[in-house]
């Protein structure tokens, strides 16, 4: 085993200029992540200088067998925390050979919104709170829970410490450091209300980079959990009953909101979001109706309401923002399995462009 570990951690820069690039893309479910690696002649820092690649879309549910080739376009580069050295992770989006985005490629449409001159001028910032649940492999039951049984009621687990309250901290600390190494703008982590559930926060990130960073963060988390023999669930309500669900609260601000007088801009943006509540809910993740019940720190899925410091609202404004008269707000509706490209672009579209 020591030899295997030595080989896994081999520093290639001592013997070759070649590097390994791990190309990452979103699979056919719209939530599964796929990746494969290739050798490059030397270090690369600009995704535009990376070669396009292809994969068998018939094996990912993204193309028919008789015309199975799907093309990967490199879009963002991160340092590889697993191979280290000059090796890289590459976030890609996927296209047909004719250059058309495939249905699961939500990045393409998001990039158009974020390149709109009105959106560019407003420099939208995002902070995404990604919740997830760690499951025991093979039994689909939260980490730390007794097999076939339940732990004590919620209360002591949120930001808790101790072997009877925090389950999977080794995984959490590992991915936290791996994100920092990779260049992901992670701002923190914490244990969540339901035992076995955790959260990491990405941001503030500008525009399309928020989606790139969340997807690569999910990929790194999945890889670390794979090593640990644990399953990551992004289900918005993994356990029925009196247990908190899992969301992806999305904090948002524009340049106008961050400047003096920004509070009025925030109120107008919230009003726009309320007018398009149904459209946003439809795009905010599968199974969200099981989570947005009006209980467990959520608003009911059928109702839009906002409030200051209200975690039972659809949109929450912080006390600091109210006091300062400028800042940001939090859209609490997105589910943990949301596509960050869709959510971030839709919020910008509704609040800045205002045509969708």
From Swiss-Prot:
Could you tell me where this protein is found in the cell?
Answer: Cytoplasm
Q: Which GO CC terms are listed, alphabetically?
A: cytoplasm
Q: Name a single GO biological process.
A: glutamine biosynthetic process
- Give every GS catalytic domain span: 106-356
| Gene3D superfamilies registered for this protein in UniProt | Glutamine synthetase, N-terminal domain, Glutamine synthetase/guanido kinase, catalytic domain
Q: Where is the GS beta-grasp domain?
A: 19-99
Q: Key word 4Fe-4S present in the record? A: no
Membrane-crossing residue ranges in chain numbering: none
Check the record and name the Pfam families matching this protein. Answer: Gln-synt_C (PF00120), Gln-synt_N (PF03951)
Identify the EC number(s): 6.3.1.2
Task: List the catalytic activities from the record.
Answer: L-glutamate + NH4(+) + ATP = L-glutamine + ADP + phosphate + H(+)
A Gene Ontology molecular function term of the record: ATP binding
Q: Which UniProt keywords apply?
A: ATP-binding, Cytoplasm, Ligase, Nucleotide-binding
Per the record, the similarity remark reads: Belongs to the glutamine synthetase family.
Additional observations = Irreversibly inhibited by the herbicide L-phosphinothricin (PPT).
- Please describe the quaternary structure of this protein: Homooctamer.
What name appears for this protein in its UniProt entry?
A: Glutamine synthetase
Q: Which organism is it from?
A: Nicotiana plumbaginifolia (Leadwort-leaved tobacco)
Read off the lineage from the record.
Answer: Eukaryota, Viridiplantae, Streptophyta, Embryophyta, Tracheophyta
């Amino acid at each position: 085993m020591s030899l295997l570990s030595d080989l896994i951690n081999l520093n290639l820069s001592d013997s070759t200029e070649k590097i390994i690039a791990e190309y990452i893309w979103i699979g056919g479910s719209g939530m599964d992540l796929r990746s494969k690696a290739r050798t490059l002649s030397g270090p690369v820092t600009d995704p535009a200088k990376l070669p396009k690649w292809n994969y068998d879309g018939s094996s990912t549910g993204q193309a028919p067998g008789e015309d199975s080739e799907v093309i990967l376009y490199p879009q963002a580069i991160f340092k590889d925390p697993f191979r280290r050295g000059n090796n890289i992770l590459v976030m890609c989006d996927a296209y047909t050979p004719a250059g058309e985005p495939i249905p699961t490629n939500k990045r393409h449409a998001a990039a158009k919104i974020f390149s709109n001159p009105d959106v560019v001028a407003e420099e939208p910032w995002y902070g995404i709170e990604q919740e997830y649940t760690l499951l025991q492999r093979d039994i689909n039951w939260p980490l730390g829970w007794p097999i076939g049984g339940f732990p004590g009621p919620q209360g002591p687990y949120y930001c808790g410490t101790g072997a009877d309250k925090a389950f999977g901290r080794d995984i959490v600390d590992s991915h936290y450091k791996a994100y920092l190494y990779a260049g992901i703008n992670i701002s923190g982590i914490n244990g969540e209300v339901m035992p076995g559930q955790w959260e990491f926060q990405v941001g503030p990130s500008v525009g399309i980079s928020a989606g790139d960073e969340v997807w690569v963060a999910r990929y790194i988390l999945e890889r670390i959990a794979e090593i640990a023999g644990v399953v990551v669930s992004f289900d918005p309500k993994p356990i029925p009953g009196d247990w908190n669900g899992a969301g992806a609260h999305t904090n948002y601000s524009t340049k106008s909101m961050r400047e003096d007088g920004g509070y009025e801009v925030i109120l107008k943006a919230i009003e726009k979001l309320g007018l398009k509540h149904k459209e946003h809910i439809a795009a905010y993740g599968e199974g969200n109706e099981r989570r947005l019940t009006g209980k467990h720190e959520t608003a009911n899925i059928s109702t839009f309401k906002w409030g200051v410091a209200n975690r039972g609202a659809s949109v929450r404004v912080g006390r600091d923002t109210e006091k300062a008269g400028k800042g940001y707000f939090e859209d609490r509706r997105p589910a943990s399995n949301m596509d960050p490209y869709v959510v971030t672009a839709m919020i910008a579209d509704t609040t800045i462009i205002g045509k969708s």
